[in-house]
Amino acid sequence: MGCFRQTRDDEDDKLRKEANKKIEKQLAKDKLLYRGTHRLLLLGAGESGKSTIVKQMRILHVNGFSPEERKQKIEDIKRNVRDAILTITGAMSTLNPPVQLEHPQNKAKVDYIQDKASQAEFDYPPIFYEYTEILWKDKGVQAAFERSNEYQLIDCAQYFLDRVHIIRQAEYTPSEQDILRCRVLTSGIFETKFSVDKVNFHMFDVGGQRDERRKWIQCFNDVTAIIFVTACSGYNMVLREDATQNRLKESLDLFKSIWNNRWLRTISVILFLNKQDLLAEKVKAGKSKIEDYFPEYARYQVPPDASSEPGEDTEVVRAKYFIRDEFLRISTASGDGRHYCYPHFTCAVDTENIRRVFDDCRDIIQRMHLRQYELL
């Protein structure tokens, strides 16, 4: 009887050892996989373009968006159209000085938009699209749109209002560009996984509004690199959540707090100077001068390392390098050689631009990863 129990105990012990071996083998495998994964944390103020960067990674490296996902985006795109026309027509009377409609008979259409389209349960009847198209062509509405830095308007307003005739169609399917442009508030933390040339990346997108930033600390552990995204076109705009704070100044303050954060002193930052297309439009229009918001711009000279695209406006080049240097001033002032800032000019809705920029960044990220695990 005792011998039988002993044999059984030996078998149980053997099974436990085999199970432990399997667990240890899996843990070692998981550890290698974990150490072989580049963790990228996307940070930046609200509406800087972080979520659009994530969408581009899906387009470039995760087979894009399925037909079902495209269908699911229709409601968000319709909401963008509604928010855009509601906001612009609503601002006409509150702007100082106010803006008048070109055609007074359109007042009834504005009243319809403000009364009906503002309701929570709005079903987008054909008359809504008809009125929206007519109002968008009204020069008074266009004049109010041109002053959109004086109120809060989503960046994609013009893009979608120009395409109402497409969006209203029953068989409408959003294009990749439509999905990239679509604005949805990010709340919480979203992880996107993808591989490039057999290298694994995990990208974490965290909401950028002030009340979302307390969640960032949850993502700081084992981060390979931070991608900080700033909207360069925000130089003449104020925050949605604080009408007293300039958007670009908020972004600079946020960058400074991240750069000097004691938990992040060894993590380098890839700086995406985003919305270069919108910055160029504003600078060339000449209506909102950077020096009116940043007086030091009046004395700024383009640095020797500046390069420009063929045919690029010289004032646009000056503007984008001024903004770059404002960020680099922060990183060099408190740099201790333990982490670095790598700036890139980006347009998040331009897939080819993001492809080129991310390809340029991959070598930097790889070096950061090797340094992180003391392999370099």
From Swiss-Prot:
Region (G2 motif): which ranges? 178-186
**UniProt-annotated stretches for the region G5 motif:** 346-351
What organism, scientifically named, is this protein from?
A: Lymnaea stagnalis (Great pond snail)
- G4 motif, as annotated region: 270-277
The record's region (G1 motif) falls at 39-52
**Pfam families membership:** G-alpha (PF00503)
Record function comment: Guanine nucleotide-binding proteins (G proteins) are involved as modulators or transducers in various transmembrane signaling systems. The G(s) protein is involved in hormonal regulation of adenylate cyclase: it activates the cyclase in response to beta-adrenergic stimuli.
Name the lineage.
Answer: Eukaryota, Metazoa, Spiralia, Lophotrochozoa, Mollusca
Q: Which GO biological process entries does UniProt record here?
A: adenylate cyclase-activating dopamine receptor signaling pathway; sensory perception of chemical stimulus
Q: Where is the lipid attached (S-palmitoyl cysteine)?
A: C3
SMART domains membership: G_alpha (SM00275)
Binding-site list for GTP: 44-51, 180-186, 205-209, 274-277, 348
Lipidation (N-palmitoyl glycine) occurs at G2
Entry keywords, A to Z: GTP-binding, Lipoprotein, Magnesium, Metal-binding, Nucleotide-binding, Palmitate, Transducer
Residue span of region G3 motif: 201-210
Q: How does it assemble?
A: G proteins are composed of 3 units; alpha, beta and gamma. The alpha chain contains the guanine nucleotide binding site.
Question: Can you name a GO cellular component term?
Answer: cytoplasm
Which PROSITE patterns does this UniProt record tie to the protein?
G_ALPHA
Annotated positions binding Mg(2+): S51, T186
Gene Ontology MF: a single term: GTPase activity
Does the record carry Nucleotide-binding as a key word? yes
Protein name according to UniProt: Guanine nucleotide-binding protein G(s) subunit alpha
Tell me its family.
Answer: Belongs to the G-alpha family. G(s) subfamily.
